[in-house]
Curated annotation (Swiss-Prot):
The lineage of its organism: Eukaryota, Metazoa, Chordata, Craniata, Vertebrata. This is Protein MFI. PANTHER family: NADH DEHYDROGENASE (UBIQUINONE) 1 BETA SUBCOMPLEX, 4, PROTEIN MFI. Can homodimerize. Interacts with MFF; the interaction inhibits MFF interaction with DNM1L. Its main location: cytoplasm. GO terms for cellular component: cytosol; mitochondrial outer membrane. Acts as an inhibitor of mitochondrial fission. Interacts with MFF and prevents DNM1L recruitment to mitochondria, promoting a more fused mitochondrial network. It is found in: Cytoplasm, Cytosol; Mitochondrion outer membrane. It comes from the Eukaryota. It comes from Rattus norvegicus.
Amino acid sequence: MSMKRPQDHSKQEMAARIIQKAWKTFLNVSVFQHFKSLIDLRRQGEPRQIVKYINPKEAELLDAAAGVQVRFRLGGVKFPPEIYYKIFTHRHIEDLCANSPRDYTKLPARYASHNKDDPPQVEDNSGWYRRIENNGWRPVSNRFWMPTENEVLESTKESEFHFSKLKRKQDLEKKRKIKKIEWMRQMYYLGSLEAKVTDRETLVLIHKATKGLIKSIEDGGVDSVMEWEVDEVLNWTNTLNFDDYIASWRETATSNSSAYLKDAKLQRIQKSLQRKIYEDETKESEEKIYYDGDFYENVYIKPLL
């Protein structure tokens, strides 16, 4: 019986680890591709019908007139990932915070409101124009009647809602500018910023401009640079357009909007009404021709001289 040396055992163990690692990688990639194929949507499907299979109670509250759209994403703290969904509305809906900005959770008690002896208290406006978005990313689970513990923190995120439309527009532009800057900074430090030109002098100038812009942002903050400067650097240094990337990302794993979908029952009612109107108009025109006709059978006509 031949005796194996310790070196042979170590080589076999190393080879086994390599095979096991490769097999585990293959399984993980296959599982991820499977989960990715489950949400492989791009403006497809009716939102209410999709939510009906996820959460039937919530599907009853969806209104097609609100322009509902459902998005899916993969997430979680462990592997395999979980599928999360979120409902978006792309039309104006009635919001109590927009009409009544007061924080009704901190109203004074009834006994204090009728107390005329004490001087009136100064009303605290600290909680006004602030809302808590309860529409966060929720995991897709077949236990829709039970509360899920793996709720993401974004559902309780507090955001400020300014009364001025101009201020809200400025805040939105600032958020978009911050996203572009973070995009450029991350690609710069990862070495993914590649210039479109091949001229050596132009490459040096682009590299210096990018480095100077990054340094200005780190020293003076986001407000130290303009948005058009960031756009210029991104246009010169990268072949991937940021706006196109964001637009494509928003359409990935997304259902169709209910604003572009028509109910089958409503279509049948509209067709029946149009058919009835057409039949009534046809019948009315035929009756008009019948009664407006000239009949001379029993009429005496005087001969011409």
